[in-house]
Amino acid sequence: MVIFWKIIGMDCAAAKPVSCSVKRNHDVKYVSTVYDFVTRGLFVLARAQVDYFFDKNGKMTVSASLKKVCPLTDQLPRFGVHAELKSEFENVEYYGRGPLENYSDFKEHSPVGIYKTTVTNMAHKYIKPQDSGNRGEVRYSVVTNQNGAGLRFNALEKYINFNANHFTLEQLKKAGHIEDLPDCDTTFTAIDGFVRGTGSGSCGPIPSREHLISFGYFKPLCFSFEVEPVEDQDKE
């Protein structure tokens, strides 16, 4: 399946802006964006709409949806929103499955609870660098610096998946060995509404149907979450 993703160019698809509109209603500002995900050959795979609602208290609500355009995009590895912070945002607290990485078909070892860790320790250090460290069924997650300032991500209609690393997915893809993976001046956070199951790994069958991510022309993937600031604990 990974080879199939590469064949159709899903692993290197880029977001091409289609439209952007801004509205204001009393104390709430609304920004709506539409993107096409295209391959290097400008072949459109899917269309995404991401809406942002900002209130006067600094809280942002994000609503994202993805609709199929290409008939080949029957399965996805994940669908979510990423954000980069400075590397000083190292501390993590979350309410979800933990303390180890877990996925929809690989989670019984990780009971639901409130866990504290660091961005450095989120990912599992496999010899061959690969996507890892996902935390599933997350109700909320908080990323802060040493002073306690940062961001809190709250699930809304359904649970979210959360991950954070000091490297980007592009750097992960290029690294051949764990020692090739740079420790960058960034905290790369991932808020995913949908994450594919692991199946039996690279040498076994793909996940069963209930752990795959399927979507269609008239049945888009949809999820939403909130982002709110966490104030510096030393601030008077």
Where are the regions a protein language model picked out?
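Beta-strand/loop-rich accessory regions of lumenal/periplasmic or secreted enzymes
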Residues: M1-E236
